[in-house]
A protein has these predicted regions:
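Post-Walker A alpha-helix
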Residues: 18-19
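Phosphate-binding/switch loop-helix module in NTP-utilizing enzymes
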Residues: 68-118
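Extreme N-terminal starter segment of soluble prokaryotic enzymes
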Residues: 1-4
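N-terminal phosphate/diphosphate-binding loop that engages ATP/GTP or pyrophosphate donors
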Residues: 24-75
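Hydrophobic anchor at the beta1->P-loop junction of P-loop NTPases
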Residues: 7
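Conserved lysine of the Walker
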Residues: 15
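The conserved Walker
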Residues: 11
Length: 153
C-alpha cells in the first residue's frame, strides 16, 4: 500500500492551498472534512472555526452552530469536542480519497473523532491530511503513524 500524505506546517504556509491544488488534479471521489476559521471575530473577539464535508462546494457550506467546532484568538481557545465527535467520524467512512484539512489542537478531547482519524490511517483509502505542528498526544500519533509519510512545508 502507498503511504498516506501528511502535510505539516505552521499556519499560513500553504497546507490547505496545496491540498486544494492536489484535489483539482485528482479524479477520485472525495471524502473527509475541511475546517475553516472565519476571518471576522465574534462579539467576544474570538474567531469561529467550522467543520464541513470536503466534498461540499465552499459556497454550500453552512456556517451555523451545528458545524461550529471551536473558537480561538491568539491566546486561548474554546473547544467543542462533541461537535467533532458528531460530525467527523461519518465523514471519514467513504470516498476514494479522504481529506483531513486540518488536524490540530481543538480536537484534543474528541476521542471518537481521534479514533476515526486513526482508523482511516490504518485503512486502504488514501488520506491527504494537513496537520498543525503542535505537540499533542493525538497529533504525535498521527505524524508517527506507520502508514503515513510526513512532508514539512
Amino acid at each position: 500500500m502507498e503511504k498516506h500524505i501528511l502535510i505539516c506546517g505552521e499556519r499560513g504556509v500553504g497546507k490547505s492551498t496545496l491540498i486544494r491544488r492536489l484535489l483539482a488534479e485528482s479524479t477520485l471521489p472525495v471524502g473527509g472534512f475541511v475546517t475553516r476559521r472565519l476571518t471576522q471575530a465574534d462579539g467576544d473577539g474570538m474567531f469561529p472555526i467550522y467543520l464541513h464535508a470536503a466534498a461540499l462546494p465552499p459556497e454550500e457550506r453552512p456556517y451555523d452552530p451545528e458545524h461550529l467546532v471551536g473558537t480561538c484568538d491568539s491566546r486561548r481557545s474554546i473547544r467543542y469536542p462533541e461537535a467533532f465527535d458528531r460530525l467527523g467520524p461519518p465523514l471519514l467512512t467513504s470516498g476514494g480519497l479522504l481529506v483531513m484539512d486540518e488536524l490540530g489542537f481543538l480536537e484534543n478531547d474528541a476521542h471518537l473523532f481521534q479514533a476515526a482519524v486513526l482508523a482511516a490511517l490504518d485503512g486502504p483509502v488514501p488520506v491527504l491530511a494537513a496537520i498543525k505542528p503542535k505537540e499533542t498526544d493525538f497529533l504525535r500519533r498521527v505524524r508517527q503513524h506507520p502508514c503515513g509519510e510526513v512532508f514539512y512545508i
